[in-house]
Amino acid sequence: MTPAAALTPTTRATFLRKHLWIPLAVALPLLFLLEVTNVDRVVSGWFFDAATGRFPLRYNATFEIVTHHWAKYVVVLIAGVVIGAWLMSFFLPMLRPVRRVLFFLGLALALAPGVVSVLKSQSHRSCPYDLVEYGGNAPHISLFEAAPPGDYPGRCFPSGHASAGFCLFAFYFAGLALRRRWMAMAGLWGGFAAGMLFGLARIAQGAHFLSHNLWSGLVCWLVVLAIYVVIFRPEAGPPAAPKANRAPG
């Protein structure tokens, strides 16, 4: 298959089934179950000390410095390198063939966490450590409930910190565009692992529930997917690349 024919109507339908409909069919029922069961509280309870009424790791220096700050800086550094490479592609002939991929990566790495941040800023759901059951003063509000009257912290859903890891899903789609299976798999599993690791650290600190992190992952996936579809539209086709190590897509 030539690059220009890489997304015919048939393969486009297959692509959307694989990257949109199947992920939604798996993620939405799982997220619904988390919403109507006690799993979130059980997981957060592992890190909550009922005797002191707090999350012992909330202000832990190692967690704050390494997993809360440094981890995000690594992702910001990656985004900075990508944007720098995209700018250099206007001057270095060797980078011109991947200019569109670099543009996609820079945009996806910025917009995926950005969308999560906007959603979080508008949310009425509070962090676990602000909830009454964990020593705070805010009520637990389900996804399907309206905000109750009163001045509560809110702005804690979905997880912004986890999105710094999940945005690395962009490298999965870059691997598809370049037909580099190793890059696609590294982006898929690396992004998932980073998002879950960043998210787990914040669960341990009482800052998020498990469902907050998984919602963040789904939002990042959908944002990155949308950007990929817009930039690598069917009529243009993905950039030319050797057929070896072609990623499925």
What are these regions (language model features)?
Residues 6-8, 37, 83-94, 172-179, ...:
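Structural signal for the C-terminal ends of transmembrane alpha-helices
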Residues 42, 97-181:
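Membrane-interface loops
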Residues 29-33, 110-115, 192-203:
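Aromatic-anchored segments of alpha-helical transmembrane domains
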Residues 87, 91-95, 122-127, 131, ...:
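Membrane-interfacial segments
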Residues 2-82, 120-128, 138:
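N-terminal transmembrane-helix/juxtamembrane module of multi-pass inner/ER membrane proteins
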Residues 10-20, 88-102, 177-188:
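Membrane-interface helix-loop-helix junctions at transmembrane boundaries of multi-pass membrane enzymes
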Residues 17-18, 141-249:
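Membrane-embedded catalytic cores of phosphoryl/pyrophosphoryl-handling enzymes
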